[in-house]
Every structure is written in structure tokens, then in C-alpha cells.
């Protein structure tokens, strides 16, 4: 049962990747770029150039999809992008995941019942910090009670702003939400991702994150171009502990490419373990993201959200690099999937720490530091939406 479930889970993911990469929005009319920031336009032009096409190509990868949905004034194109992303693997083709989902549900139910549990959730939660289904429902209901009034208020504000801009007959649709919530955020806080992007040059962010790791844990990173990598975009670093001893190999794989899964994650190519001779075999870990690639005119520039993503996945990589156990199956991130998020969520909190931002957040053209007033606006806007 578990083997079949594993194979179906893998097939599910492969189908999603296939559908994700199959879609592109090819624009040749420059007027259809209205509202988009220069960084998104330049990245789309680069995509088209790499495919030997004229114009601009937008994809369902987050660095392309997110700014399009947030800034594009072309409502019908937003709808097209939204529907493409949110109907993946539901079409009448060989990538449809409906039957896979049905089979997985039945397999999990059968597995749980064979082991004496009422549901698969009961089986899984037996070894999680929540312990049981009742505790999960209690937490969810507590969160709903705490946040629902604010959520209703903010959604109403977004709808009112949209009607103010478009007329009283305007009806909000899912593909409008990012666009108008951004408008409301600008109205409330005068802040958006593109205002911050020039201060978050990827190379500087890397230096800042490595410097933070050195300050907190005493470890150092040294790029080693002799280490074999699996793609030219990937960089490899040797990591050394505070006493100078070898700790790990760290791979940085930051940019989208054909066939690469969307999103961000940390993975291990080699886990830590103690071999039969007593040697401490050190781990090889990788942080994988899909940040906007550099162009001929600009270096890779991140949003604050992407800085936070980097810190989150870097937290996972630290979990892997600091591993020191006998068995590889128990080392690093090979822990229950609720606790595994603790190091990552701890690290991502540094994204809005002033002292951390001051170590690397400088305008890529002028060298000016990120203004304190912008940092204050960031903090104030954190609880919005």
C-alpha cells in the first residue's frame, strides 16, 4: 500500500510540473504590459529571447506569475493566467490527477484501518506534536475566531476600493484579488514589493545570510568552483565550523529553468551519518528556489518575500548541515514534518530585523542603505492580508 501510494504521489507531482511548464502567455502587443514593473517586463523579455521569440513570455513560475497578477491592468489576461494555474491537472489529458487523488484517498484510508485507526489523519497525528484530530480542529477554530473578523473587514475594504476604481457594478473575481489588495496596501502603507527590490540584490543577500549564520553559529561559507554542480546556474560552497573543521557542502540553486519544479525547498544529496569505521560523513545540502534571473541590464533583485523564502529554506539547510547522528535515516531534516519547520521559521523572522537588513540591504545602483522609514512601513504592513 505504501509503495503504491509513494508512486502515485510521485506521479501527481510530475503531472503538476508538466502542466506548469506547458503553459506560457506570449505577449507581442506592448500595450498589454500596462501596469507591470520593469523587472517583470525585463524577465519576460529574457524568457522570450531564450525561446527565440519576439515580445514577452510570462509563465506560471512564481517570479513571473506573481507580479503579473499583482500589477497587470489587463483583467482578461489575469483571468487567463489564474485559470491556467488553478486548473492544472484537471483537464482531459494524460496529466489529469483526479483518479490519482481518488486512489490515494482510498489507499490512505485502507492503510489507516489496517493499522487500527479510524482515519488517515488519526494515523499521521499519532506521531505529531498535535497528537490527535481534536487538537488540530481546536487550533484551526481558535485561529478562525481570532482572524476571521479582520479578514472579513480587509476583504470588504478591497471590494470597496475596487468599486471605487471601477464602478458600483464591478464584481470581484479571484483573478482580481492580488491586483486590488496591492492597491489597498499602497493606499494604507505606501509600500509594495517593487519599492524594496532594488535594495535586495541577490549576491548581497547571500552575503548577508552567510554573515548572519556566522554571527549566530560561527560557521563560514567558501565558494569552491572545483566542486561538480548539476547546472551552470548552481554554485557550491564548502562550509566550515567555528573551529575550522569541515562541516558540509552547500549548493545554491536559485533560478528557474526548463523542467525545474516551481516553488522553493531544501534537499539533501548526501545525509550525515557515522560509517562503520567511525568516520563522520558530512552532508551535502541544497537550497532550491525560483528567483527572477539577472538580465543584461540588471542583477538578480529579490522581493522581501523572496528574502524571507531564502531564510526559511536556509534554516532547513542549517538543520541538515549541523546533523551529528549515527544513522543517516535519523539525521538532519529526517524528523517528523511538523517539527521540521521549527529551524526554518526561526530563521525567516530575521527578514525584518533592522540589524540584519543593515548588513546587506543597499540600493544596487546608488549604494544607499534601505531607509529606516521603509523598514518601519514593512513592519506595520506585516499583518495586512
Feature-to-residue mapping (PLM):
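A short, flexible low-complexity segment enriched in Lys/Arg and Gly/Pro that occurs
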Residues: 83-102
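Second-shell loop/turn segments in exported
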Residues: 64-68, 89-94, 125-136
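Short, charge-rich amphipathic alpha-helices with coiled-coil/heptad character
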Residues: 71-89
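Zinc-dependent metallopeptidase catalytic helix centered on the HExxH motif
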Residues: 309, 313, 317-350
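Short, histidine-centered active-site or binding-site loop motifs used for metal coordination
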Residues: 62, 85, 291-295
Amino acid at each position: 500500500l505504501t509503495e503504491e501510494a509513494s508512486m502515485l504521489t510521485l506521479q501527481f507531482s510530475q503531472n503538476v510540473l508538466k502542466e506548469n511548464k506547458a503553459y506560457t502567455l506570449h505577449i507581442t502587443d506592448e500595450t498589454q504590459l500596462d501596469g507591470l514593473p520593469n523587472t517583470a517586463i525585463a524577465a519576460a523579455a529574457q524568457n522570450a529571447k531564450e525561446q527565440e521569440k519576439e515580445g514577452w513570455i510570462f509563465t506560471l513560475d512564481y517570479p513571473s506569475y506573481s507580479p503579473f497578477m499583482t500589477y497587470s491592468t489587463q483583467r482578461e489576461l489575469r483571468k487567463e493566467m489564474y485559470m491556467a494555474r488553478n486548473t492544472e491537472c484537471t483537464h482531459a489529458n494524460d496529466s489529469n490527477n483526479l483518479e490519482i487523488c481518488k486512489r490515494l484517498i482510498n489507499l490512505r484510508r485502507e492503510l489507516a484501518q489496517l493499522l487500527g485507526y479510524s482515519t488517515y489523519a488519526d494515523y499521521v497525528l499519532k506521531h505529531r506534536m498535535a497528537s490527535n484530530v481534536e487538537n488540530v480542529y481546536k487550533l484551526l477554530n481558535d485561529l478562525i475566531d481570532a482572524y476571521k473578523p479582520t479578514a472579513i473587514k480587509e476583504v470588504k475594504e478591497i471590494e470597496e476600493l475596487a468599486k471605487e476604481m471601477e464602478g458600483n457594478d464591478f464584481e470581484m473575481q479571484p483573478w482580481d484579488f492580488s491586483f486590488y489588495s496591492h492597491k489597498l496596501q499602497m493606499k494604507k502603507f505606501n509600500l509594495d514589493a517593487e519599492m524594496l527590490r532594488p535594495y535586495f540584490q541577490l549576491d548581497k543577500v547571500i552575503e548577508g545570510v552567510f554573515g548572519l549564520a556566522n554571527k549566530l553559529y560561527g560557521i563560514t561559507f567558501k565558494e569552491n568552483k572545483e566542486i561538480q554542480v548539476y547546472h551552470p546556474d548552481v554554485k557550491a560552497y564548502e562550509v566550515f565550523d567555528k573551529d575550522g573543521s569541515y562541516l558540509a557542502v552547500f549548493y545554491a540553486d536559485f533560478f528557474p529553468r526548463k523542467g525545474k519544479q516551481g516553488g522553493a525547498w531544501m534537499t539533501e544529496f548526501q545525509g550525515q551519518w557515522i560509517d562503520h569505521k567511525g568516520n563522520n560523513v558530512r552532508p551535502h545540502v541544497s537550497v532550491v528556489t525560483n528567483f527572477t534571473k539577472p538580465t543584461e541590464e540588471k542583477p538578480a533583485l529579490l522581493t522581501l518575500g523572496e528574502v524571507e523564502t531564502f531564510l526559511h529554506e536556509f534554516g532547513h539547510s542549517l538543520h541538515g548541515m549541523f546533523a551529528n547522528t549515527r544513522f543517516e535515516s535519523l539525521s538532519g531534516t529526517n524528523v517528523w514534518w511538523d517539527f521540521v519547520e521549527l529551524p526554518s521559521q526561526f530563521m525567516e523572522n530575521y527578514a525584518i530585523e533592522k540589524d540584519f537588513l543593515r548588513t546587506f540591504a543597499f540600493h544596487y545602483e546608488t549604494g544607499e542603505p534601505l531607509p529606516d522609514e521603509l523598514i518601519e512601513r514593512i513592519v506595520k504592513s506585516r499583518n495586512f492580508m
